[in-house]
């Protein structure tokens, strides 16, 4: 979906799919494709009618190895470094009409928005796990590390930090689970709650992991412990599947 000039503004994408008989010819460049180098099948959004704006966007299934489709450079990301994130290029890439999602043109943008509604609680769950892991490490470390003749956790200022971290995590957990239950129940109008869960859980993850680094002191800034990785991994959850500013 994303391109160099169209991230949050997904409706402004420039990749085109021009009909040629019973085929479509794709031309364009895609950015920020998670698992871009390892996937075998891709959903590609392109303009089939540029004059209609977002209503002219259609979705296509494109398989790896299709002539004209190549995987580009891998991004050097700050976090989630085990996940390959790649650029994708389409140059006169021919796909048959049978690979038009939904069987008709113009439904791509709606398809993308419905997909994101269900993906955002997943990102929220990812963030929740990062926050929970950071809290557990922080509790363990502050209960063992001694300063000024007592454990770090014995200081009331540290207890307040840990209490806030735990409170925010539990609030995020309820939003994540509630949105997941609605999806499992077949609810269709989930856009608002999905956005709320995504915003709150990912902001919580960023705060909690940052505070955990602080509680570890110098060790939090090193790779002796996984805390610095949690903080780096948490950052992307505020960005992908719709930035938190757009969700608000």
Each language-model region and where it sits:
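A gly/ser-rich beta-alpha-beta helix-loop segment of oxidoreductase catalytic cores
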Residues: 1-19
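Glycine-rich phosphate/pyrophosphate-binding beta-alpha loops
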Residues: 6-8, 31-37, 80, 117-122, ...
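Cytochrome P450 core scaffold surrounding the K-helix E-X-X-R motif
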Residues: 8, 99-105
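Flexible, small-/acidic-enriched active-site or ligand-binding loops
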Residues: 12-14, 65-94
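Conserved hydrophobic/aromatic beta-strand scaffold that supports enzyme active sites
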Residues: 12-16, 23, 41-45, 59-61, ...
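Alpha-helical interface subdomain recognition
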Residues: 19-24, 87-93, 103-107, 114-248
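Short loop segments at secondary-structure junctions
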Residues: 20-22, 47-51, 64-67, 91-98
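A short core secondary-structure module
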Residues: 27-71
């Amino acid at each position: 979906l994303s391109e160099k000039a169209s991230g949050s503004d997904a409706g402004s994408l420039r990749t085109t799919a021009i009909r040629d008989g019973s085929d479509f010819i794709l031309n364009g460049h895609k950015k920020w494709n998670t698992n871009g180098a390892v996937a075998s099948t891709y959903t590609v959004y392109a303009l089939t009618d540029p004059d209609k704006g977002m209503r002219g966007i259609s979705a296509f299934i494109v398989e790896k190895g299709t002539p004209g489709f190549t995987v580009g450079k891998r991004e050097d990301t700050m976090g989630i470094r085990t996940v390959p994130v790649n650029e994708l290029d389409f140059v006169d890439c021919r796909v048959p009409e049978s690979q038009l999602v939904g069987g008709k043109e113009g439904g791509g943008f709606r398809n993308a928005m419905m997909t994101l509604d269900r993906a955002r609680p997943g990102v929220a769950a990812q963030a929740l796990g990062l926050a929970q892991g950071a809290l557990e490490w922080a509790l363990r470390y502050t209960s063992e590390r001694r300063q000024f003749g007592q454990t770090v956790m014995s200081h009331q200022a540290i207890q307040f930090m840990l209490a806030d971290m735990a409170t925010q995590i539990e609030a995020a957990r309820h939003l994540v689970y509630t949105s997941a239950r609605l999806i499992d129940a077949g609810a269709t109008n989930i856009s608002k709650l999905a956005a709320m869960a995504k915003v709150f859980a990912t902001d919580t993850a960023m705060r909690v992991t940052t505070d955990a680094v602080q509680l570890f002191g110098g060790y939090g800034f090193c790779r002796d412990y996984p805390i610095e990785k949690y903080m780096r991994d948490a950052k992307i959850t505020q960005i992908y599947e719709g930035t938190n500013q757009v969700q608000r």
